[in-house]
Curated annotation (Swiss-Prot):
Protein name (Swiss-Prot/TrEMBL): Hemagglutinin-neuraminidase
Glycosylation sites (chain numbering): N44, N111, N268, N280, N382, N513
Stretches of the chain found on the membrane's Intravirion side: 1-18
Uppermost EC category: hydrolase
Keywords: Disulfide bond, Glycoprotein, Hemagglutinin, Host cell membrane, Host membrane, Host-virus interaction, Hydrolase, Membrane, Signal-anchor, Transmembrane, Transmembrane helix, Viral attachment to host cell, Viral envelope protein, Virion, Virus entry into host cell
Organism of origin: Simian virus 41
Length: 568
């Protein structure tokens, strides 16, 4: 079942449930009124004959009827709110496991893609894209040793080769992965090809998961795709890239964005590629780049994180210019007046290095059906709630939508936001985001925005290092941030240089566990983390994908690391 279908079923179930409760309540009221009328009518007759009336028996009768109705209502509530959802989840797992065992299905989907083979092990289906710890969790978390899994990520095979910019998306059914293959050196503007793979999570005989590759695609057609972002969709993968023909600085200086491409690759090896023409891009954006991290398939839409430069005095520029987000670290006192800090924060969105463009984050939203890419739209984040535009990632966890934003500006700690926009009501004018306060996991960067800086400045630096929420930072009914909120990932624990990749589990203010490599000078770059659970054994695992510096084959090699999260 896709994420969109699951959400639709849940909304339908809630609507039926609410209607049922209203009908039961009205029935109780009607019965109570009828009983009261009958009792009153009977009592009037008795008074006329006997002139004596004792209301105790009447009240006892009414109370007994109401108690029995309340007991029935409580049973209905329990069955509808607890027992039935658990039964549905159990039935879903059984059905998906049965489909996997049969290993075939009718090619009834529009892309004729058989879905029977492309299905994760039943042990993991319901442990993917879920909160993995309770909101009240007060135990300890650690990370086990590295688990020896076969790598699903190919590396460079020549000293001058390079693999960069990994993007990984995992859903209940399968995973999708992509990276850039640079033929000579690691410069972003160099000619390159794009590698794409899809596969499933399986259980190994050693009692931990591994990632089995089912299909691969090597896009080697002379088109220089860059900064690609991937999404796992029903039956396959969707890949969004921009086509690089000049340097990054030249892109921002231009007034027409580079070509954008959306590629669909299905399990039956159907390949469809579209060139995007987006109505609200030309005239507003100098350049519009995929944000590297994976997107999501949400409520029938493909949603990719994007960022780029808004042209001065364009409609989009005017709607965002002057807006600013100013998070504060309670442990850090910044110099200057509040007004000076506000003015600096406002100015941090406009970068002279990039021709004075306003660097903006946004989401590219496309309906998936029939690959209707002419209906794609770009929706801006509200800059009063997010930092300067940067690379990022979208997640769906426990039905909630999240956005990781690379800390490319002056705030050096990790940046995660909960998206509060309801896409079921159509595309919004702006995306509303709620910052998840955290003050740890800094990234290295150039001065004055090296690791540990929390005061406004004008910078564009840092490195991509997304995070994974282990439980809900904003539980339902809570008025603030969950004090037990935990998250995990991998980051480069250094002030300036891109070195010392380190695995961690942390709260907003405290590292719960950190584990690095023997050599703290180990070169590294981008890191991406995805955590999931074996619902049979209840064991939690995190997959850390890290660009590791290489002295043998190319400047960087992308390596997948798997660790168990140890709960005590």
């Amino acid at each position: 079942m896709s994420g969109a279908e699951g959400n639709t079923n849940k909304r339908t179930f809630r609507a039926v449930f609410r209607t049922l409760i209203i009908l039961i309540t009205l029935t109780i009221l009607a019965l109570s009124a009828a009983i009261l009328y009958e009792v009153t009518h009977t009592s009037n007759g008795s008074e006329s004959n006997n002139q004596v009336f004792d209301p105790t028996d009447t009240l006892n009768a009414i109370t007994g009827n109401i108690k029995s109705m309340i007991a029935l209502l409580n049973q209905i509530l329990y069955n509808a709110a607890i027992a039935l959802p658990l039964k549905i989840d159990s039935t879903e797992s059984v059905l998906l496991a049965a489909i996997k065992d049969l290993q075939f299905s009718n090619p009834a989907s529009q892309n004729c893609s058989s879905g029977g083979n492309l299905l994760n092990d039943a042990l993991y289906i319901n442990g993917i894209n879920q909160y993995l710890l309770s909101n009240s969790f007060a135990g300890t978390v650690g990370l086990g040793p590295l688990l020896n899994i076969p790598s699903f990520i190919p590396s460079a095979t020549a000293p001058g080769g390079c693999t960069r910019i990994p993007s990984f998306s995992l859903t209940k059914t399968h995973w999708c992965y992509s990276h850039n293959v640079i033929l000579a050196g690691c410069a972003d503007s160099k000619a390159s090809n794009q590698y794409l793979a899809m596969g499933i999570v399986e259980q190994s005989s050693a009692d931990f998961p591994f990632f089995r590759t089912m299909r691969t695609l090597y896009l080697s057609d002379g088109i220089n795709r860059k900064s690609c972002s991937i999404v796992a969709i029903p039956g396959g993968c969707a890949l969004y890239c921009y086509v690089a023909t000049k340097t990054e600085q030249e892109d921002y200086a231009a007034t027409t964005p580079s070509e954008l491409r959306l590629t669909f690759y299905y399990y039956n090896e159907t390949l469809v590629e579209r060139t995007l023409t987006i109505p609200n891009v030309t005239g507003n954006w100098a350049t519009l780049n995929p944000a590297v991290g994976s997107g999501v398939y949400h409520l029938g839409y493909l949603a990719f994180p994007v960022y780029g430069g808004l042209i001065q005095n364009s409609a989009a520029w005017n709607s965002q210019f002057g807006s600013y987000f100013l998070p504060q670290n309670p442990a850090v006192q910044c110099s200057g007046s509040a007004e000076q800090q506000i003015n600096t924060a406002k100015g941090s969105y406009v970068v002279n290095w990039f021709s004075g463009r306003l660097i903006q984050s946004a989401v590219l939203v496309c309906p998936l059906s029939d690959q209707l890419t002419d209906q794609c739209r770009v929706v801006l984040f509200n800059n009063s709630e997010t930092m300067m535009g940067a690379e990022g990632r979208l997640y769906t966890i426990g039905g909630d939508l999240y956005y990781y934003q690379r800390s490319s500006s002056w705030w050096t700690a990790s940046l995660l936001y909960k998206i509060n926009t309801d896409f079921s009501q159509g595309l919004p004018p702006l995306i509303e985001a709620q910052w998840v306060p955290t003050y740890l996991v800094p990234r290295p960067g150039a001065q004055p925005c090296s690791a540990g800086n929390f005061c406004p400045a004008n910078c564009i630096t840092g490195v991509y290092a997304d995070v994974w929420p282990m439980n809900n930072p904003f539980p339902a009914g809570s008025s603030g941030v969950n004090p037990n909120y935990l998250f995990g990932g991998a980051f480069l624990w250094a002030d300036v240089a891109r070195v010392n990749p380190t695995f961690y589990m942390a709260s907003a203010t405290q590292y719960k566990n950190t584990t690095g490599f023997p050599n703290s000078n180990q070169k590294a770059a981008y890191t991406s983390t995805t955590c999931f659970q074996n619902t049979g054994s209840k064991k939690i695992y995190c997959l850390f994908i890290i660009e590791m510096g290489s002295s043998l084959m190319g400047e960087f090699q992308i390596v997948p690391f798997l660790r168990e999260v140890i709960i005590t």
